[in-house]
C-alpha cells in the first residue's frame, strides 16, 4: 500500500523552483531512460544539414521546456490530488525528452535557445491559469498541447536528413510518449478543445518555432 505525500504551500514552491532550475540550467536535467540515440551511429552530414538539424532539435528542446512549465503550473493549481499527480508524472517523463534533445543539440555543436526562460515563464502562467479554471480544462489543455507537439514532430521527422538516425530515434520515441500523454489526459476527463482554440494555439506555437530555430 502506497502512502500519499502531502506538501505544504512552501514545499510546493520549493519544488517548483527546483524543477525550474532543472529545466533551464544546462546539463541539469537527468533522464530516467537512456536516449534512444545511443544505439544509433553518428551520421556524416554537411555543415548545412547539421545546422538545420540543430535548429530543429533546438525547437523541440524549447517545446519540452514549455511542456515542463505547463505541467508544473497545472500541478500547482490542480484541484484534485489525482490530477496533480498525473501532471507531476507527465513532467517527469518530459525530463527524458528535455535531456535527450539537449544531448543531441550539444552533439551537433550547438546550444539550447536563449529564449527558454521567457517561454518557461509564459507556459507556467498558462498552465497555472488553466488549473485555476478547472481540472477538466487543464487536462484538455494538455491533450491539445500534445496534439500540437505531435504535429511538429511529424514535420521534423520529414525534414531530417535520411542518414541522421540519432535524431530520428529521439523524435520517434518522443512522438510515442506525447501521443500517450494526450490519450491519458482525455481518458482522465479532459475537455476536447474546439478547432478555433487549437488554431490559436498553433499560431502561438509558430512564434516559438520561428524564434528558437536560430536563437
Curated annotation (Swiss-Prot):
One of its GO terms (molecular function) is 3-demethoxyubiquinol 3-hydroxylase activity. It comes from the Bacteria. It catalyses: a 5-methoxy-2-methyl-3-(all-trans-polyprenyl)benzene-1,4-diol + AH2 + O2 = a 3-demethylubiquinol + A + H2O. Keywords: Cell membrane, Iron, Membrane, Metal-binding, Monooxygenase, Oxidoreductase, Ubiquinone biosynthesis. Its cofactor is Fe cation. Its main location: membrane. Its EC number is 1.14.99.60. GO terms for cellular component: plasma membrane. The keyword Metal-binding applies. It is a peripheral membrane protein. It holds the Pfam family COQ7. It is found in: Cell membrane. Pathway: Cofactor biosynthesis; ubiquinone biosynthesis. InterPro entries: COQ7_proteobact, Ferritin-like, Ferritin-like_SF, Ubq_synth_Coq7. Binds 2 iron ions per subunit. One of its GO terms (biological process) is ubiquinone biosynthetic process. Catalyzes the hydroxylation of 2-nonaprenyl-3-methyl-6-methoxy-1,4-benzoquinol during ubiquinone biosynthesis. This is 3-demethoxyubiquinol 3-hydroxylase. It comes from Pseudomonas fluorescens (strain ATCC BAA-477 / NRRL B-23932 / Pf-5). The lineage of its organism: Bacteria, Pseudomonadati, Pseudomonadota, Gammaproteobacteria, Pseudomonadales. The gene is coq7.
Amino acid at each position: 500500500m502506497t502512502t500519499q505525500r502531502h506538501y505544504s504551500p512552501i514545499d510546493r514552491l520549493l519544488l517548483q523552483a527546483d524543477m525550474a532550475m532543472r529545466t533551464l540550467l544546462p546539463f541539469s536535467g537527468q533522464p530516467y531512460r537512456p536516449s534512444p540515440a545511443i544505439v544509433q551511429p553518428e551520421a556524416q552530414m554537411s555543415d548545412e544539414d547539421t545546422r538545420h538539424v540543430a535548429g530543429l532539435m533546438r525547437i523541440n528542446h524549447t517545446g519540452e521546456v514549455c511542456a515542463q512549465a505547463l505541467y508544473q503550473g497545472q500541478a500547482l493549481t490542480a484541484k484534485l490530488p489525482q490530477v496533480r499527480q498525473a501532471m507531476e508524472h507527465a513532467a517527469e517523463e518530459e525530463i527524458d525528452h528535455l535531456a535527450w534533445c539537449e544531448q543531441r543539440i550539444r552533439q551537433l555543436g550547438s546550444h539550447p535557445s536563449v529564449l527558454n526562460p521567457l517561454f518557461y515563464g509564459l507556459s507556467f502562467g498558462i498552465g497555472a491559469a488553466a488549473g485555476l479554471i478547472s481540472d477538466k480544462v487543464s487536462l484538455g489543455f494538455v491533450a491539445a498541447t500534445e496534439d500540437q507537439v505531435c504535429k511538429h514532430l511529424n514535420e521534423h521527422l520529414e525534414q531530417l536528413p535520411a542518414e541522421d538516425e540519432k535524431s530520428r530515434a529521439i523524435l520517434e520515441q518522443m512522438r510515442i510518449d506525447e501521443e500517450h500523454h494526450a490519450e491519458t489526459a482525455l481518458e482522465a476527463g479532459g475537455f476536447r478543445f474546439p478547432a478555433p482554440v487549437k488554431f490559436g494555439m498553433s499560431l502561438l506555437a509558430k512564434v516559438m518555432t520561428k524564434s528558437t530555430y536560430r536563437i
